[in-house]
Amino acid sequence: ANISIMGTSGAGKTFTLQLMALRMRRKGIQVFIIAPLKGHEFLRACRNTGGEFIQISPASKNCINVMEIRKTDKSVDELLDGAPIEKSELAAKIQQLHIFFSLLIPDMNHEERQLLDEALVKTYNKKGITHDNESLENPDDPGHYREMPILGDLYDILVATPETKRMANILNRLVHGSASTFNQHTNVNLDNKYTVLDISELSGDLLTAGMFVALDYVWDKTKENRPVEKAVFIDECWQLIG
């Protein structure tokens, strides 16, 4: 089910949204809140409920690694539907990353998209990850995935080739520049039952990149174990579609 909350400025839309989120959390429903504006308004309630407040911004130490292939619990789905159709998790992740880079580099041409695809495959291959899903498993830590690449690993491959150096130059902002906080391994709790993703300090092309990172994570979690109730709230949604 979908709900839209509308009203004039100051009518209490954010308050109503937060009240609904807190009541759902009290009922045991997993809650995700994405805040493109006024993220600080969710901080106090988030802390008081033991939630995870994730601030995605160049100045923040928080990071969700956009290149991470996340291990998801599909045990309940398998009980309901039987063994799933085997699909390459690497291929699915790379398709998502193509969307991320199309937002970051909107004028990318067809040749560059192909070269980017090859660079992404090579980046994961260097970590021992192939289209065989079993390659994701960490042989030194059973039950967990291997260490994932970060944007800096991709940058090193792109910058080494003249044909992909333009893409590397644009990506450099997120690797060595003012937004290098994106170039880290995930350092936040992604399993908390009350998660607020604050992207209010982002603007321009970084807003679209940050929104992708937030939605990519939320989508991964909502697909996990479908019988488990989850609620996704987006405050000031117009900021993202306007």
Regions found by a protein language model. Give the residues of each.
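P-loop NTPase motor domains
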Residues: 1, 38, 47-51, 58-60, ...
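Glycine-rich phosphate-binding loop of nucleotide-binding enzymes
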Residues: 1-58
